[in-house]
Structures are given as C-alpha cells and as structure tokens.
C-alpha cells in the first residue's frame, strides 16, 4: 500500500474541517473542503490518484478540478450512496471511492446530498471549477503547474501524471493517444476503463443519479487520460482532453449534474497557496509513489473529507489516520513526499520555530501531505497569519515543542514533545532526520504512543489546529489557532521544565542521532504507554497538548511528567532522552523495586564471561570395577579393525543323513525339472450319485448341452371358430419324426376332430406326407 499519501492532499480550508482518512488510503482524492466543511465542494477528487481506476495518478485530473479527466471514480463518486460510508471504506482500496464522494459518503461529516450537490454544483461548476483551478494553481509544484495548465491550456490534452495511468494506458499511448483515446474505439475505452466501469456502474447505481451517458463520457475522458503518458509531469496535465476547461471535461465525464465539479469548491486562494506549499512536497512524492503503486496495484482511494465536526472527533480521526499514514506509507515514498513538503513547509513557515511548523520531518516513509490534515491539528504547511499567531501564543511552548519535535526525530516517541512533530513516526526511526512538515504525523505518532501519545496529540491538535486552521480557514482559522495556541501554552507549561533554549539545544543534539534516538524513542513510546514515557517525551507537555482534545491533556500531562521522570534502563537511551527532555531523571537509587528488580538494573544479558575449563582426568591411579580398567584406554569408534576371513574347509565334514551331497548346492538356480503327472480321478474315484460325469466340467465354456423341451400347446390347441380346415404344424426342431405334426382341426364345438373325423385325419396325413417329401 505504498500509495503515495502525498498525492492525496486533503485541502482543508479550516481547522474545523478535517480530511478523513489518510491521503494515502484515500487514493489521489484531495478533498478540498470549505471552512463550512462542504464535502461536495470540499471533496476535490484530485484525480491524482484516480489512477487506481485510470491506472494513473493524474495530478492533471486533480488539476482539472479533479474533473478534467473524470475518472470512473469521479463518475461513480456521485453515484456512491451518501449513506454508505462503509461501502466507500471498503471500496477505497479497490472500489476507489469516487472523487466526488461527499464527506457523508466518505463517512464523515454532513455533506449535501448528491442531488443538492448536483443542484449547487451545476450552478457552481464554472465558478467552483475556476476556484478549484485557482486553488490548485496556488499550489506550488506539479499541482499548481497542473492546475495552471488545466485552466490555462484548456486545449491541451490531459497528460496523466501518475505512472498508473501509464501502466493502464495501452502501450504506445501518449499525448497523441490522448486525443486518439477520446476518439479511440469504444473497445479501448472499455478495456482501459473496464475496471472503472465495473466499479463505477455499481456506484452509479447506488447513486442512481448518473445518467447512462456518463459511463461513455467518463470512458472517453479516461481513455484520453489513460492514453496520455503516465510520466507526463503533473504540470503537463491540461484541462480536458477535448480541450474543454477541466471543469467542463469533468462535468461531462462525470455527467453528474450534482458533481460537475465534484471537488470544485471555491477555496480561498490563499488557502490553496498555503496548501500548495504542502502539496508540491507531497506531489513529487505522489507521482513517484503513484507510479509505483499504479504499476503494482491500483491505489486505494481514500477520500479526505473535510468535516466540521467537533475538534475531538477530528483529533480522533486524525490520530487514526495519522497512525495509518505514519506507518502505512512506504518509508521510501513517504520520505520523498515529506522532503519536498518539509522544505516547502519550512519556507512557508519560515518561523523561528521550525520544530513547530516543521515537526521533525516525518520519516519519509510517512507521506505528510497524504495524511488527512485535521482541521485543528494540521496547520497548512503554509502558516500564514494564524501560524505566526500560534507561534506567538506558543513561543513558550515552542521551545519545549521544538525540543520535543526534534526529539521525535531522535526517538519517534519524542514526537510527543513537539505538537507539530506529528510527522515523526515511530515506524521509521531512521527517517526522523527530516522534521515532518505537518503535525499530522506527530499526531499519528502520538496516537501510537498510547495515552502519552494521545496527550501529545491533544497538544498537537491545539498547535496543529491553530496552524492548520490558519492556512485552511485563512484569518479566522488563524484566530482559532491562536486560541488553541494559547491553550497549548497552558498545557505545555509542564514542558517548560526544560528551558526553551535547553529544549532547542536538545533538539539540535537529537537530530544527528536521529536514527538511534528514534529507535530508542520508539521503545520509550511503548514506555510512555506503559507509564514509563521516555523522559524526553513526557517531559514535553507539548506532545500531550498535541492531542486534539485540549481538555484532557492537562490531566494527562502530570501523568506523563511522572512517566517521563522514570529514566530508561538503558544508559544510552536515558542520555538521549535526558538531552531531549530537560526534566531531571528520577533517582533510581532511592527507588525501591518490586522483588529486588533494581539489583538487575545494570544486568547485561547474554551471559558474562564464562570460562570453560577442560581438565584431563588422571586415570592412572583409578581402580576399575570388575576388571574394566583394562578397557580404560579404549578408544570408542573403533581404531583399526581387522576382519579376518577364514574360509571353512568342508572337505572333512561328515553330513547328517547324507546331506553332504547338497553341500555344494547353489540355491536359486540350477536345472529344475518340473514333472507334471495328470491324475485321472475317474479311474480312482467313485462319484456320488453319478456326479462323476461332471468331473471334467469346464465352467463357462466347453461343450454345453442344450436341452430343448417342445411345447405342445399348439398341437393341443383348438380353434375358436370351426373353419373345417386342418392346421398342420411343423415343429422347428428336427426330430426323428420328420412327418409334420398334425394339429387337430378342432372346431369350437369339436365337431371336426381327428378322432371324430377319421377321413380328415387320413387326408391330413397324406397332405403332410406329401409336403414332407417335397421338403416343406
């Protein structure tokens, strides 16, 4: 499932809106949602990962409002039942959730019904498409380029960005094929889009809102998309293959009145720009990941639906998604996406506290952009306005957070210290060196870390929410972010135990040992869960505050602090943790362990130095029992063994009973004479009751005697009617009596009878005799 999450960037306008599902899971569907959390507009299916169906990740389709090349998913998206989030969830891997799936469909938030969306979108299509384009254009990197091309080059054929398209494209398909694909025979369309149609039509049925024509349109668009070269960079993506604006193509492809611009929701341009910084990073990764995935397997399409649920829900989702994103992302793909995103995020943030804005880059294995950004938690990497406000509010926290963030790199566990470190994921400790640009991963990491992780996530949620809210919601999210930030400082106060400067120092120290520390950090995470939280991670209240649920962190923080105090048993891990967290290590000397476990604190498993001394036994003075001493020098296994063969001389042997004659007998051969004597039992044996005749009987054959008994009923038969004629019957069996047998001519009354009429009898005899002579 190395589906690039990066390609799936959830464009969340608002801290309140939050993308559901890992971007990775959600395929290339970037859900651009308004602050209102309108899933219809918000769900911008970025055809980036429509590739699952198209076989290509089409940033271009995403560019074209994710519509320029309506994928089967786009077409089917409207069809997806809004009330079947579970369906979509199941479909996400293969039944790619149509890009048009609403948040409700995705199973999150209240999304206008497909019909409502259709009504709204029909009117909004042009505008929303434009806005979306602007948003995408605002996005730096392939997306912005693709959007620009989409909006700017309506005539240009859509070039599928993802290798998936290429994989699905018939060989030889290229930009030329793109147009050819439009006009390509329905066979090609059906072949390429067969998968999409199969999935799409059922979805359409579910939606029931798509017109039958949608399939064909989608097929055409898809064929074009698929035919378009995979490798074409997202920037190449042009609006519709037909040269229509991406929105138009999208509409036609979708053919869904409700989803003309399924993802098209007018998003604040600044938000798009903010997201764009995030997206470019994710996008670079997206195409590569998309290609790999496209070739390997259709990406799972997860829809990031920005919802405006209460922050806690977002936090819970974000934790889950972050957990998924953190570990699910292939380390290779994730890092690539994160690298760019981190760079961009850093640029955008350019805030003194890169740790907050750029939590240690989540290990590349964890795509940042792909993880749905929680409204509260994910600060769009472009932290305009609110980002700075959050920073101000968090300055105190930031120092600790920075240290914490840096710690997460060192030890994935430590991401808890930095609320913005969500990117740091225990799954890839070595990758930690890049601070994750988005707090998403931190949240995922914190979620994994258990209670301490949750607390951290809460803090992250506060920080991330403020940060993310700023990019998404523009100024208002920023304010929310500030409020969150203010909250976070209160939560983070426990972190202040380590001065900000010390925290930053710790952060600096940790980054180099990121690999080992992360490894160590991961065990601490388990420790945190167990209550041990590594000193570093508990020490930083920021991690606690990360958890979106702000109210809980304060209560949890003290626990974490206590946990942090427990130093790790391994000195190296303890050192790294101490560096990361200025919190003094608890004195183990004063601690009484259960069952004297402290005694073994320094125990080094694997055995100490064991000396095996081989002492030779002096057997010279030993007295053996029963004279066994003679064999004391016996070497088992036989030394030189001599087998003496003495031929036996039988010449002088006398045999018993004259058996000597057979002494030279060679068994198994010689001349064998078999004499067979036939015994004639007839001569010697007297049979019982004359059975001797059958003594030579050969069963199943031989001479058989067939005895035939003549049935004389005909001869005795009398005619019912007196016809006065004599019936002569010649028996088929040849007997000594060749004369034909006379069947008496009997009248029913018996008036004519051989006995009664001797004349007739004589006549019959004469006739029969004459006939017999003639051979009749």
UniProtKB/Swiss-Prot annotation:
The modification Phosphoserine is found at residues 46, 61, 502, 526, 530, 533-534, 537, 549, 570, 572, 597, 620, 624, 628, 640, 659, 687, 691, 731, 735, 739, 744, 751, 757. Residues 1-591, 733-752 are annotated as: Disordered. Tau/MAP repeats lie at residues 579-609, 610-640, 641-671, 672-703. The modification N6,N6-dimethyllysine is found at residues 480, 646. The modification Phosphothreonine is found at residues 69, 71, 111, 470, 486, 492, 498, 540, 547, 552, 566, 738, 762. Interacts with MARK1, MARK2, MARK3 and MARK4. Interacts with SQSTM1 when polyubiquitinated. Interacts with PSMC2 through SQSTM1. Interacts with FKBP4. Binds to CSNK1D. Interacts with SGK1. Interacts with EPM2A; the interaction dephosphorylates MAPT at Ser-396. Interacts with PIN1. Interacts with LRRK2. Interacts with LRP1, leading to endocytosis; this interaction is reduced in the presence of LRPAP1/RAP. This is Microtubule-associated protein tau. It comes from Hylobates lar. The lineage of its organism: Eukaryota, Metazoa, Chordata, Craniata, Vertebrata.
